A protein has these predicted regions:
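Hydrophobic alpha-helical connector segments
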Residues: 58, 72-99, 147-151
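Hydrophobic/aromatic-rich alpha-helical bundle segments in the mid-to-C-terminal region
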Residues: 116-120, 135-184
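N-terminal intrinsically disordered/low-complexity leader segments
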Residues: 1-8
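Helix-turn-helix
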Residues: 12, 16, 20-54, 58
Length: 184
């Protein structure tokens, strides 16, 4: 009986690449290391990427799409009114741990101006989405900007700064934070 290893998808490579980035920075994102974690030979890498630099480029796109675009470009969220959209966004960010790799990306951005531009563009996507939502709620100027930035900062760093929150604590704090953000 032979154990045939199924082909590993591009997204599986990228997901493991993000985990490697989180665990050890950009120097830890090595083809051989990721292949070993996936339980395959490194030759499988070349089905999806020409080289390590191409992996990095796709890694940035994957992070943007799967950890920001999933909220900001979500047609189901956009159908909701602004209050429900804000709450649903909070829940999605927490449930899917969408801020999980933000620290790793921020640290990588400090070492490379190209990466910094992409990370800044992702932050802008998040802020623009939230600015539009808070504007729909009637906020303007500094009140709008403070809410958008507070939301982005808290949700991007919650898993890093408060990793031991229980579900009950998180739920209680999320309700309070939501009420705080929508009150005039």
């Amino acid at each position: 009986m032979t154990n045939k290893i199924s082909r590993v998808s591009k997204d599986q490579w990228l997901a493991k690449g993000l985990e490697a980035l989180e665990a050890g920075g950009i120097e830890a994102v090595k083809v051989e290391r990721i292949a070993k974690v996936l339980g395959i030979s490194r030759s499988g890498f070349y089905w999806h990427f020409k080289n390590r630099q191409e992996l990095f480029d796709h890694l940035l796109n994957y992070w943007t799409r799967e950890y920001t675009g999933i909220v900001t470009d979500n047609p189901d969220l956009m159908k909701l009114g602004p209050k429900k959209r804000l709450l649903a966004s909070m829940e999605m960010i927490r449930d899917k741990h969408l801020g999980k790799f933000d620290l790793a990306m921020t640290l990588w951005a400090k070492t490379d101006s190209k990466i910094r531009k992409i990370v800044n563009a992702v932050v802008k996507m998040r802020l623009d989405y939230l600015r539009a939502t808070f504007a729909e709620l009637g906020f303007k100027g500094d009140e709008l900007e403070m809410r958008a930035r507070l939301f982005v900062c808290y949700h991007a760093w919650e898993d890093t700064v408060f990793p031991d929150l229980t579900d009950q604590q998180h739920s209680k704090l999320q309700k309070l934070r939501y009420q705080y953000l929508i009150q005039n």
